[in-house]
Amino acid sequence: MERKLKVVLICHFSNGEMREHLPLGKRKLYSFIQRLLGRGGEPYKYMDVASWNTNFVNYFKVRDDVELTVISAHTGLKKYQVHFEVDGVNYYFVKCDHATMLKHIIMNPKWWTKLNPMRPIVRKIVHKINPDIVALMGAENPHYSSTILGLEKEYPCIFKAQTIYNNPDRSKHGYFNKINAYVEKQIFDRLPYASVSTRMHYLLYRGFRKDSYNFQWEFGTTFYPVEKVEKKEYDFVNFAVGVSEAKGYGDAIKALAIVKRTHPDVKLNLVGSQSTEYYQQCLKMVTDLGLQDNVTFTPSFELQKDVFQHIQKARFALLPYKLDYISSTTWQAMYYEMPVICYKTMGTPTINKEKECILIAEMENVESLAEKMLVLLDNPVKADELRKNAKQLVDSKNDGKKISDEIVRNFRAIVDHYNNGTPIPKEYLLTF
């Protein structure tokens, strides 16, 4: 039997189980600043973040051929570093508040990267562990992703692209930060091992680097038991971490105004953090369009399982995101047997490759979005067909053992290539 593979995962995640071990403050200053900026300012609420990292841990902690250490950023820690062990996995949580605050003070990306206070802490932890491989989940969030820079000289390092921040369309749909862009580009330049597993992101990535080794690395999805709600309160729900333009909240409101012409009592629930400027724009949009009786805003939930329970109150999922390949919310709604409407991204049509599982509207076309909403409202037979097809598809894709087997195989090949120059089998590599 091969010796255990020592893996370090660098990421940013949070869930209820982890927070039980963390000394967390109330972040009163943060809430005060939010009030000054007119963004609500309600008491800070810690929430489940980045469930794909929870998935990774769940898949790996049951393996007997891997020794996993997770180094994660976390807001609100009362200490700079917290270490504990659960179910054979070692966790190091590192305070990230100062790193994110410095982004508003040090505008030069190169200097910010050098002065990021998380970097020496993470570097020291990695040296202590001395892993076989370091894996970075996401290159677009610099407070933690920049901590891998330099480690590639000592260890084989691979990054998993959740998205490509240096996407020309990003500035059209939301906030663009030059530090985020700079750090991501540095990671592209320095790390020869990558996992960019969607065609859209792969083509963008290859515009920056053409000679790296690209591997498959599936996320998987974690679900929780829910109680079915027979009497629905809403027709449609859009849910995400925060109310944002990139997640299509405004387009959902505009499309609802069209649907209301023939369905005056139609109801839409918008779930997500309300501490954003865009939330205020959405409130005004609802008033201007006379939808006060049709739209309900629900704040974000602390636990992801509570989000999943809440969305049971809606009949359909309206998820017109614009930058994602396929948002995790799509798979989540499909799993809970909610017929889904999305925009046509480069990824969403692939869901319908074998059977029609979701309805797809033309990108940023609210008339097309409204047409799909009417299909679900007026054609229950069609809605039921989509529901069944979608559930079958998501169940077939969510095999944690298969996902982790592939990742471990690839990680071992990377270690052998880095240390011994052993060629990586072509069948391990992913191209489009």
Residues covered by each model-derived region:
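Conserved donor-binding/catalytic core segment of Leloir-type glycosyltransferases
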Residues: V8-I10, S195, K228-K247, I253-L256, ...
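Conserved acidic donor-binding segment of nucleotide-sugar-dependent glycosyltransferases
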Residues: E354, I358-V366, V375-P380
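Nucleotide-activated donor-binding/catalytic signature segment of Leloir-type glycosyltransferases, i.e.
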Residues: Q280-F301
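Short hydrophobic beta-strand element within catalytic cores of glycosyltransferases
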Residues: P339-C342, L359
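A short, well-ordered alpha-helix in the C-terminal region of glycosyltransferases
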Residues: S368, V375, K382-K397, I403
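N-terminal subdomain of nucleotide-sugar transferases
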Residues: M1-K79, V89, L430-F432
